[in-house]
Amino acid sequence: MQIGQRLGTPLSPSATRVMLLGAGELGKEVIIALQRLGVEVIAVDRYPNAPGHQVAHRAHVIDMTDPDALRALVDAERPHLVVPEIEAIATDALAAIEAAGVCEVIPTARATQLTMNREGIRRLAAEELGLPTSPYAFAQSFDEFAAAVARIGFPCVVKPVMSSSGKGQSVLRSEADIEPAWRYAMAGGRVNHGRVIVEGFIRFDYEITQLTVRAIDPASGQTRTSFCAPIGHLQVAGDYVESWQPQPMSAKALERSRDIAHRVTSALGGRGIFGVELFVRGDDVWFSEVSPRPHDTGLVTLASQRQSEFELHARAILGLPVEPALATPAASAVIYGGLDEAGIAFEGVRDALAVPGADLRLFGKPESFAKRRMGVALATGANVDEARERAKRAAAAVRPVSAR
């Protein structure tokens, strides 16, 4: 495959083939962006009829943590690029695939290995790169966990080293929280082993996601780093419920945020978009986490930027030029399922879209849970405050209902 020079025709011998590992709502938007560039897309997930399955050329259901199943599928499909969109993947198999020259892993196999759990990326950021982070400790057993909490002190945060969307994450404020927090962390991890990170609580003014793009500069042919405007977000129990762009911040804090983002993404390497999560207080900035893929808080870019984070990712991985500029202030607000049922319906869509500047993305997930993210409302405005009010009003208008 000639990166940045040639794209083929889907379903033909000339096709440029991309396999996405993970076909949720973020993967779905990446697939749509790739489809618009004439790319043949293979979507893979652990359950049938995932959102990305519905828009891909081909769909597969496998256990992506099974290295043999993953390698067999890659050998059968022969993609030019493999693009992980979730963390729960057999990353050692990806490393072997990359080393054998079977295909390119985005951004790199090493990056997927380091970011698949919080331990790898925290040690890279704090111990190798010397980036400012919260105090932290890792624990493998309940006794180690209790000792780590005693060492870090209250309040503190516990997270499974392998989890996403706030699963298994809680804040400990006293000794009475220790045992329940351990049980919750064990239930929320993606794999069956009890390793957690305990983090000291940082008293921050706000959190941001600094979307960072590593793409080929057409003038030099070299990889260049560029940045989207900072995204502010509100999280509840570790899960994003609202985001907006741009987040107002001081020039010094923005400079420090981008320096941290540049350093950590350069260490990970490769091409694509990275979601770098940071805590900010005044001019001070602390590194939190990084995802080597589009970020859920970045759904706001579907309204705020001419090229969304998904289009930026698609272009960057294909070696094409990117333009991450902000077009307008915008916001997003999550629409939850509200009930536990397969094949739900949505009422109030007309009212939601009647809100000035509003738009919707209903993800098409086949099964709803009360707190499962089933869609998102987007809105533009003259400023962030107006956009946030509109997005929340549009989201509140949508009513998930039983289809029975």
Swiss-Prot record:
This enzyme's EC code(s): 6.3.1.21
Binding residues annotated for ATP, in chain numbering: 118, 159, 164-169, 199-202, 207
Sequence positions that bind Mg(2+): 277, 289
Residues that hold N(1)-(5-phospho-beta-D-ribosyl)glycinamide according to the record: 25-26, 85, 296, 365, 372-373
Pfam families listed in its UniProt record: ATP-grasp (PF02222), PurT_C (PF21244), RS_preATP-grasp-like (PF22660)
Keyword Metal-binding found: yes
Catalytic activity: N(1)-(5-phospho-beta-D-ribosyl)glycinamide + formate + ATP = N(2)-formyl-N(1)-(5-phospho-beta-D-ribosyl)glycinamide + ADP + phosphate + H(+)
Record GO biological process: 'de novo' IMP biosynthetic process
Gene3D superfamilies the UniProt entry points to: 3.40.50.20, ATP-grasp fold, A domain, ATP-grasp fold, B domain
UniProt family annotation: Belongs to the PurK/PurT family.
Protein name: Formate-dependent phosphoribosylglycinamide formyltransferase
Lineage: Bacteria, Pseudomonadati, Pseudomonadota, Betaproteobacteria, Burkholderiales
